[in-house]
Structures are given as C-alpha cells and as structure tokens.
Design a protein with these regions (language model features):
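Structural signature of alpha-solenoid helical repeat scaffolds
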Residues: 8-9, 42, 76, 110, ...
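Canonical tetratricopeptide repeat
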Residues: 53, 87, 121, 155-158
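Alpha-helical adaptor scaffolds
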Residues: 22, 46-111
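Structural signature of tandem alpha-helical TPR/SEL1-like repeats
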Residues: 27-39, 60-73, 94-107, 129-138, ...
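Helical anchoring/docking segments at protein termini
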Residues: 1-4, 10, 171-178
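Alpha-helical segment of the N-proximal tetratricopeptide repeat
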Residues: 10-49, 53-60
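TPR/TPR-like (Sel1-like) alpha-helical repeat modules
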Residues: 116, 127-153, 157-164
Length: 178
C-alpha cells in the first residue's frame, strides 16, 4: 500500500482526526483531551478512535462509567478493536465487575494469543476475586512477555501474596493500569 493510498483510507483519516486528542492525552491534559474528543465524536459519530481515546481520557480522570460507555461505543463501531476491548476490560475491573473483565480479557486472548495487556487484565481480575490459582497462571504468563518494570514489580507483589510470602496491603484492588 502506498503512502498516498494510506492517507485516503477512511480508517487512516479517522485515526488522523483523533490525533490531537491523543496528543493531549499523552501530554497529561485529560480535560482538554475530553473536550477535543467529544467534539470529534459529535462531528464524526463513526470514529471508533474518538470513542476509544475518549474512554482512555475518562479512565485517567477515574470517571469509569463514562469510560466504559465510550469503550462500548468504540466496540459497536469496530467489534474487533483490541485496544477498546482492553480499555473496557480494565474499566470493568476498576468498577468491580471482575467476571465481565475476565471475559473481555479472554476474548482478546482468543484472537491475540499471549497479549500481555490481556494476560495482566485476566490475572489481576482473578487476583481481585481471590481466585489465586487462576491469577497465578495468567500473571506468570504475563511476566514472560517482558513487561515494563513498574507493572512487573506490581505483578511480582501479587504473586508473593498468592504464594503467602507477604500479606496483601489495604486497597490491593487499586492497581496500576496498562
């Protein structure tokens, strides 16, 4: 595919339209990103990227119901959108909807094999449910994906709790998100 053809591709155009909101989000400007992405979603309600990154911005603000709604909209437009599935799954986990979060993560694993983000999602949700053996399986597989140090240390901490080496800390369900 030539670069000219890629720019004319409707999916590429939708991605480009969402770039300003993505940049604001990456710069830590979640409120501005929300404004930008809401504007884009109103202008182009078929833009799955607007809804996905809007979900991410709401997640950053801990506005989980709004985040979930945005991720679901992205998935209505693009049912196979892995990023939106993972975002929805992490949001469900933060809302305490562990079974639904696990199902979402497993859906990603069915299509993506050993996706690190999905392994973390499923393992963390099982851990939060107290299903230690299932959590251990997924979290150990997650560590095999060579994750970033911060998340790897968090997962090592969960595994230490599972093995009985340390006691869980208060608020153990509030974990770092990918």
């Amino acid at each position: 595919m030539t670069e000219e053809r890629a720019v004319d591709d409707p999916q590429s155009k939708r991605w480009e339209a969402a770039e300003e909101g993505m940049e604001l989000l990456h710069a830590g400007e979640a409120d501005q990103a929300i404004d930008e992405l809401l504007q884009l979603a109103r202008k182009d309600p078929q833009n799955e990227y607007a809804f996905h990154f809007l979900g991410h911005a709401y997640f950053e603000k801990e506005a989980y119901p709004e985040a979930l709604k945005s991720y679901v909209e992205a998935l209505k437009l693009a049912p196979g959108y892995v990023g939106a599935m993972l975002g929805a799954g992490q949001t469900l986990r933060m809302l305490g909807e562990y079974d639904r979060a696990i199902r979402m993560g497993q859906r990603v694993l069915q299509s993506q094999g050993n996706d690190g983000d999905a392994l973390f999602l499923v393992g963390a949700a099982h851990f939060q449910k107290g299903e230690n053996q299932a959590a251990k399986r997924y979290l150990e597989r997650f560590l095999e994906t060579s994750p970033e140090l911060e998340v790897a240390l968090e997962v090592e901490g969960m595994l230490q709790v599972i093995r009985g080496e340390v006691l869980p800390f208060p608020g153990a369900e509030d974990t770092v998100e990918n």
